[in-house]
């Protein structure tokens, strides 16, 4: 894969882009292709720009971790100054087009999504506290709310409650991954939940958070009267998450934690697809 494409973290940002599209299609009475395309373009540029900036800022961390040592910057495939310029150009384009093409309120959420990931999480919190992902997680809320604001022209409590399905899923997902690579994070000096609270406590917290996230997603879907097809999709992901989360909580083994991580990965995607299906 081209190193500049890798800098965009496509396996991460596609879910944020999907969240923005789901917010738009869920809220718009009469969605149109031009608006949807503009939203996708803006979401791609702003999230990709933030991801590329994260690569630039964390290049020393990436070099110290086995999991990330082959990324473009520590591997010498991209010069740091080029990565910085690339990230800033994409970010500026995404934010500017967010205001120009989508309007003031959606544009504000585009900016907030970028800010929470690139500045709050990456620059301010990542190396300082294990609570870093709780600050950065608001980027997930913002992407959904930006799409919702574009479709509805406003943001209401309904939208905020749905956006917190994303917020709850993010730390449970990231911490489960961090548990597997906890030695890497210790080596790099990055505080993450599994490296600061002890392994048994981390397993309990992550498992319970996964269970809470799955339960919240299912409750939201039922409370807002979702359809049968979408309900089947969401239920499949939720059941898998609850089953593996309960098993991880009971056994507290690395294998069980990894199974929970893999099982919980699709649940947010299924929820967002269900929102689109019910639009």
Swiss-Prot record:
It comes from the Archaea. It is found in: Cell membrane. Pathway: Porphyrin-containing compound metabolism; heme O biosynthesis; heme O from protoheme: step 1/1. GO terms for molecular function: protoheme IX farnesyltransferase activity. Pfam families: UbiA. It is a multi-pass membrane protein. It is an enzyme of class 2 (transferase). GO terms for cellular component: plasma membrane. Carbon 2 of the heme B porphyrin ring is defined according to the Fischer nomenclature. This is Protoheme IX farnesyltransferase. The gene is ctaB.
